[in-house]
Amino acid sequence: MSTRDLVLTALFAAIIVALGLLPPISLGFIPVPITAQSLGVMMAGVVLGARRGAIAVLIVLLLVAIGLPVLSGGRGGLAIFASPTAGFLVGWIFGAFVTGYLSERLVNHGQSGLVQTVSFFLAAMIGGIVVLYAFGITYLATVAGLGFTKAFVGSMAFIPGDVIKAVVAALLGRAVMVGYPLLPARA
């Protein structure tokens, strides 16, 4: 990994942590709060690509594991990984990877701005919502004893906000691609 890669992954880890400074919004009927940090996960995948995006998320989760209060609401420590929300945290890694993987394959410099933006949006939707929810809902249903259907239905309240986050990530991805393309070169 080059110095540039290290700096970029550390930068996006810091962005994800900074998004955690925004207070979480609890819905009350499901133990998972609405946070801005999933936007950081989508942005890491869209801007950095699969490998670097996943590494940025891993850095954040390592900071959580050693006890730093870097999650929304000032949460941190190993106990977080035993909570009902742990599946979403693990899903961050795979969500960033899939978002980045799809971004690397769907977006190229020869496309129009609209096609690039839509491609980034699709990548963020699939990686940052579908993949993330697959991990989070499955773990939540198992650990909280809600059952898959109840966990799934309860999680649907987060979809509108996550779609907005995917739009923001797509617009950011397009802006970065125009000004300073960071996505790894395709083979």
Swiss-Prot record:
PANTHER family: BIOTIN TRANSPORTER BIOY, BIOTIN TRANSPORTER BIOY-RELATED. InterPro entries: BioY (IPR003784). Disruption phenotype: Mutant exhibits lower biotin uptake and has a diminished capacity to form nodules on bean plants. It is found in: Cell inner membrane. Part of a biotin transporter complex composed of BioM, BioN and BioY. GO terms for molecular function: biotin transmembrane transporter activity. Involved in biotin uptake. Belongs to the BioY family. This is Biotin transporter BioY. Keywords: Cell inner membrane, Cell membrane, Membrane, Transmembrane, Transmembrane helix, Transport. It comes from the Bacteria. Induction: Expression is repressed by biotin. Disulfide bonds: none annotated. The chain crosses the membrane at residues 10-30, 53-73, 78-98, 120-140, 152-172. It is a multi-pass membrane protein. GO terms for cellular component: plasma membrane. The keyword Ligase does not apply.
